[in-house]
């Protein structure tokens, strides 16, 4: 018997649970009768045990309300035991006295003890007195014996069997893991899983949520009560709000599910047994149907195949007989093997079916009439009998037809070759291509005709062979002799026609050859004289149409003289043209007399009379055109010469004037007469005189435009071009403007740096001394020599090179490789005058800042104009020193950045 105390938990009603000897309420030595239950557990047990008792008492038409009061007289206790056991108990005593009640309870306890349950620890007096703990313990003992003890799953029973049953049923469900009868059931999913496993239509399991246990529990309780007739024995709130639900209450309720579904399992077992029997029967019926269909199909195939094998009617051609042989071999190779397999499978299926029927106590299978295995074997024997000799008969027929078919094929091949050779021959012999042929064509046609005559004679043997084969096929009674005879007759008739046409064509070719030889001599004469004359006309046309390009009067006068000489040769050329055309007319007369259609092309030349006449007419048209073109060009060259002289006269005045002005400007920029203001005034007057000269340049531009419009590209009367004049004018304006700007910058530098007039003249003298080419700029070596002359230590050593590179970076920051006079003055002024420095600006900011190392925005706005103050605030970096105040600005880095000593 199963030990319900295997988990080592104390038995709450004073016993050790079922022991090895099957006792359910073994007495404990240390049992305290006054020990009270956990209030939550007691509440759960009262509700569960009451509902369980009522689920059985209602069968007797009664129920209890208070479990520890309603069982005190023992009457309903005895009734409960009769209902759940199905046995009659001794007649109860109906008295109201205490002794009557004790006797009734003892009768109930004696009945429980008779079922192998130890009830020594349960006293009838305590039940009669309404001891709740003892009453609940007694009911739990009854539940164990009559509701749980009989549960058996595999080799486990009672509690372990019920737990294993729950685990098996809920295993497929997510979030369900039944390990006990307390906390495994708190979320309600296990109850719902049990119901869904047996009655899936009652529960929508996928919609349940593990985090909503009250809803899950109520759903399971309501469905069980409504559809499974299992009363609600538990409260969802009690289970959820209890850390560890009462195990006995849960077991009692779960056992009701077990008993409710056990009936369904029995019905399912019975249904499975019926289905198994029906499945065997259906399988047998399916095998019977398969046998009937397979046998019917096989017999039908045999019935259709035997007449085909028995047909021995000969065919006309070897191809047809070979096809029959191929069909037979295809039958033996493709069609028959599956049928052999079907016949074998049919016998196997029949034997298997009979064995299954015999083993399942079914009557033997009797196929339909004519579909017995013996009927199939008989039909198969007839089939194999029909096969015998069929292949041998086919091979004999093929051997008989093979020579005859070979002879017929030989006839067809020779006839086809001959017909292919004769194709187009009649049309070729009938054509009159010689009427339009040249002499060389006629000779080629005669040689070609001779070759054809040789080929015709060679084909005579083939025609005779074709006729002989046709005669042999007639004698062997070939089935297609009529078509052979018709084809042979057609070949013979065509052969006679070809012979007649060959003779007629030879005569026509020889006659035409003689006539064309005469015409050919005339064509040769024509070609010898037409070719040189045609070349002369083409050369003349090229010369008359030649695009002459002349630039002088002398050149056009030479062209006019050459043209006059050409015109003097035209009468002799016209007489030669008439003689050449007369030769062509004579050749055409002979062709017309003998009905010869000339192709129109002289084989010796491509120059036709039409070409000669066309080119001669073209020469006649080009001569006056050339006359007019030469006269027009002569007039144009005379006009161009006048334009050249006009432009040269003006250019020879403007060019030297600009050159003189350029030299004077260079001299003014170098010489140092008077003050800078005097030089500036003199240069501006000089600039105005240059601007006043511009109308002369505009007049020259007008003359140049006329020259360009006349497409005059050279002028021997002057060395000046308009491009030279324009460049010189632009250079003149640029030079005077640059020189004025240099003087203005020198004045600005002098005033800003406090340079005296004597110092400025000294700087100019030094600069001019080393500006050897008078270009207005010093190269690096010239500048170094100048610095050395002024006392700077820039000799060719390491220290001197470093100093020179520093100075060059100041005067030539762009790295152009030259030093202008303005850059030279700036450098010298910085070296000789007092200038602002970064240190001076830092000192000024320190005064504004009150001798602090930083300055604030308020101090800048207070001491500087608004625009300069905001400029400084926007560009000054925050001051990071240890004495920095909020909003402190770094005026030192700002000052050094102003002079390029750091980044702004």
Curated annotation (Swiss-Prot):
User: Where on this chain does Ca(2+) 2 bind?
Assistant: 812, 814, 816, 818
Which SUPFAM superfamilies has this protein been placed in?
Calponin-homology domain, CH-domain (SSF47576), EF-hand (SSF47473), Spectrin repeat (SSF46966)
Q: Where is the Calponin-homology (CH) domain?
A: 43-147, 156-262
What do the Gene Ontology cellular component annotations say? anchoring junction; cell junction; cell projection; cortical actin cytoskeleton; cytoplasm; nucleus; perinuclear region of cytoplasm; plasma membrane
Q: Where is the EF-hand domain?
A: 758-793, 799-834
Tell me the residue numbers annotated for binding Ca(2+) 1: 771, 773, 782
Q: What stretches of residues are Spectrin repeats? A: 286-396, 406-511, 521-632, 642-745
Q: Name one Pfam family in it.
A: CH
**PROSITE patterns given for it?**
ACTININ_1, ACTININ_2, CH, EF_HAND_2
Location relative to the cell? Nucleus; Cytoplasm; Cell junction; Cytoplasm, Perinuclear region
Question: Where is it predominantly found?
Answer: nucleus
Region span, Disordered: 1-27
What biological processes does GO assign it? actin cytoskeleton organization; muscle cell development; peroxisome proliferator activated receptor signaling pathway; positive regulation of transcription by RNA polymerase II; protein transport; retinoic acid receptor signaling pathway
One of the record's GO molecular function terms: transcription coactivator activity
The segment annotated Actin-binding runs over 1-259
Q: Which UniProt keywords apply?
A: Actin-binding, Calcium, Cell junction, Cytoplasm, Metal-binding, Nucleus, Protein transport, Repeat, Transport
Keyword check for rRNA-binding? no
Family per similarity comment: Belongs to the alpha-actinin family.
Its function, per the record, reads:
F-actin cross-linking protein which is thought to anchor actin to a variety of intracellular structures. This is a bundling protein. Probably involved in vesicular trafficking via its association with the CART complex. Involved in tight junction assembly in epithelial cells. May also function as a transcriptional coactivator, stimulating transcription mediated by nuclear hormone receptors.
Its assembly, as annotated, is: Homodimer; antiparallel. Component of the CART complex. May interact with nuclear receptors.
Q: What is known of its domains?
A: Contains one Leu-Xaa-Xaa-Leu-Leu (LXXLL) motif that may mediate interaction with nuclear receptors.
Q: What is the name listed in the Swiss-Prot or TrEMBL entry for this protein?
A: Alpha-actinin-4
